[in-house]
């Protein structure tokens, strides 16, 4: 009786894992839909949930930010009582977006983190296994099979709580993960396992931080860093600060050249209501 609606494309790993393999192996009905979340209107996804009695839905934070710009009436137009969970992944989920969709749906919204290379969640609260409290903006804890470590980018030493580090996994990787690059075993090793001297660890190339309760937060790619007057600033932290403004729907931060500081951050924002600017 379970029906899963994953809004991805088959060309992406989310489509493979959660439109085809996962739901069908589990004996679920799976819905494959081609289109954007606002055509013909911003209620199309919720109409699908109503008409097909969707119980589990999976999409990306960007899609939710797109819906955040639309008339909230579309969320109330359809009966989504069948929906038990909304899963979000594919990019860091900022706290304001997490809060907004949780309050709008009044359903559990599960942030989780993984990569194309892993095929399934690295960090998750696994609500189907045990009921674990979640924190807005956090994909929770390492999934079963992942021996996760946060390492200092320069020293390779494990960092403490509330310290930023590179998200790594001590091998072996669990089943379902990428095991090589086709016909190029050495390339696979050199790309993913040689970032730290004298340490054989799988590198995600993502920044992460762990709080005192053990919850992990993903801060973005290790190459998404702006060097401002010698200070390395992650774009994710700046984007989250800007997106906390109630009239901001989407934001992206990049570094631009500056004669004095080398680089300075510039934010490009999409507002929800242009008449209020």
Language-model features: locations:
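Active-site glycine-centered loops adjacent to acidic/histidine catalytic or metal-binding residues
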Residues: 9, 90, 114, 140, ...
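Acidic-histidine catalytic/liganding microenvironments
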Residues: 70, 185, 245-246
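Beta-strand->loop->alpha-helix junctions that form or flank phosphate-binding loops
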Residues: 110-117, 140, 254-257
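Conserved ATP/PPi-binding loop(s) of AMP-dependent carboxylate-activating enzymes
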Residues: 141-145, 157-194, 233
């Amino acid at each position: 009786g379970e029906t899963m609606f994953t809004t991805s494309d088959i060309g992406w790993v989310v489509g493979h894992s959660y439109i085809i393999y996962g739901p069908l192996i589990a004996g679920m009905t799976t819905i494959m839909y081609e289109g954007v979340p606002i055509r013909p209107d911003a209620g199309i996804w919720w109409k699908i949930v109503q008409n097909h009695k969707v119980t589990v839905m999976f999409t990306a934070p960007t899609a939710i930010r797109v819906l955040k710009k639309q008339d909230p009436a579309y969320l109330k137009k359809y009966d989504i009582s069948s929906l038990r969970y909304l899963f979000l992944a594919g990019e860091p989920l900022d706290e304001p977006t997490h809060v907004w969709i949780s309050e709008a749906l009044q359903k559990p919204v599960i942030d989780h983190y993984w990569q194309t290379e892993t095929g399934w969640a690295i960090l998750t609260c696994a609500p189907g296994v045990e009921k674990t409290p979640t924190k807005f903006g956090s994909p929770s804890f390492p999934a079963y099979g992942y021996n996760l470590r946060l390492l200092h980018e320069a020293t390779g030493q494990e960092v403490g709580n509330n310290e930023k580090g590179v998200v790594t996994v001590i091998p072996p990787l669990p089943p379902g993960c990428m095991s090589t690059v086709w016909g190029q075993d050495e390339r696979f090793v050199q790309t993913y396992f040689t970032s730290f001297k004298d340490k054989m660890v799988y590198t995600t190339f993502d920044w992460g931080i762990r709080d005192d309760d053990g919850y992990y937060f993903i801060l973005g790619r290790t190459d998404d860093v702006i060097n401002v007057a010698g200070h390395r600033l992650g774009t994710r932290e700046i984007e989250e600060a800007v997106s906390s403004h109630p009239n901001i729907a989407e934001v992206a931060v990049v570094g631009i050249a500056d004669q004095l500081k080398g680089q300075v951050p510039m934010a490009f924002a999409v507002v929800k209501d242009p008449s209020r600017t």
